[in-house]
Regions:
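Histidine- and acidic-residue-rich, metal-dependent catalytic cores
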Residues: 1-188
């Protein structure tokens, strides 16, 4: 699985370690929640592969150094659908497919690719989504500098207060990840 994560991460210089950072943090949180080791390992795989659909997205979009247009953003959003399409072809990956492909869903139904609501999302779906947000906020991207833990948590708490992401998982991320330094993915 790691080779697929490496391919995804190396597709764009600005997400060079994103998939593995998500996988590592998802693993820490899964252990924090006391999931059995088999589930922890499967969640790690979901973290590594959650952006595999970006292989279908042009690097011109992935590395654009400015805000995406509405059309470009809609195109970028297709990566979550392609993650679902790719992973759903693998027998025995049903749970991994769900956790990986729902990482942009929001509890109020405003997310993508399926517009699921909180009642349709498991705790593990919500966990991968929250960790992906945390990781994305902490990383440098073509259009922004990475944020420190306190700023990431402020944004995530705001999102939780608006019913977008799970408030309990957000607070648990603060407890478990507060001592970690910002992402090593720095670009000067």
């Amino acid at each position: 699985m790691n080779v697929f994560g490496q391919i995804v991460d190396y597709k764009s210089s600005f997400t060079r370690s994103h998939s593995f950072s998500v996988a590592e943090k998802v693993t820490k949180m899964a252990r924090f929640y006391g999931y059995d080791e088999s589930t922890v390992e499967r969640m790690y795989i979901a973290g590594v592969l959650h952006d595999i659909g970006k292989m279908a997205v042009s690097n011109d979009i992935l590395e654009k150094p400015a805000k995406l247009s509405e059309t470009e953003f809609a195109y970028m959003q297709t990566h979550a659908w392609y993650t679902y399409v790719i992973l759903s072809q693998i027998n025995g990956f049903e749970d991994i497919t769900e956790w990986a492909s729902l990482h942009h869903e929001k509890l109020n139904g405003s997310g993508y690719p399926f517009g699921k609501t909180g009642k349709d999302m498991s705790e593990k779906d919500r966990l991968v989504a929250c960790v992906d947000i945390y990781q994305a906020l902490s990383e440098d991207r073509p259009y922004k500098k990475g944020m420190d833990h306190a700023k990431c948590m402020s944004i995530m708490r705001d999102m939780a207060s608006r019913g977008l992401i799970d408030a309990r998982i957000t607070e648990d991320i603060d407890k478990k990840l507060s001592g970690e330094k910002r992402s090593e993915n720095r670009h000067k």
